[in-house]
C-alpha cells in the first residue's frame, strides 16, 4: 500500500443553527422564525446573517446578477432585511428585487399598505401567495409569490425582451401554480 486513505466525518462543531429551534416555512413564517432564522430585530442572528449575505453580492464588479429573490423574507415581518435588499439593488442599479410584502394569512389591504410604503424602480411585489405541488412530497403547499415569479421573468426574457412586462396570457402565465391562496374579486384586483 503506497498511500493510506482515511475518511473522517465532521464531529461536533456548530454551523450557526440551533437544531432545537423549529424551522418555520410557508404559512408558519413569523418575525421570530423564518426558515429557522430569528429576524425579529436588526441585531438578531438571522438578520445579521442575511445582511452579510446581501452585502457579499452588493458589488456589481464582483457579481453579475440581474434578479434577486429572497422567499421567506416578508416585509411585514422582516422589514429590516427587506429594506437592506432594496438598498443593495438600488445601489447596484443593475438588479431587480422580487419581494414579498405580506405573509400567507394577510389581507389584500395589508398587502396594499406594505406595497405603498415601497418607493423604488428596482422592486416588484406580488399578492397573493400561490399554491403549488411540493416536488419532494407531491402534496399541495402554499408558497410566497417570490418563489415562482423569477421563473416568469426568465421565461419572459427568453421569449420577448427585458422591457416587456411579464403579463398577459403569453408571458404572464404562472408555470407551476395550481391556484392562489386567496382569490381576489374584480374590485380587489383593480386596487
Each model region followed by its residue ranges:
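A glycine- and small-residue-enriched flexible loop/hinge signal that marks low-structured segments
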Residues: 1-191
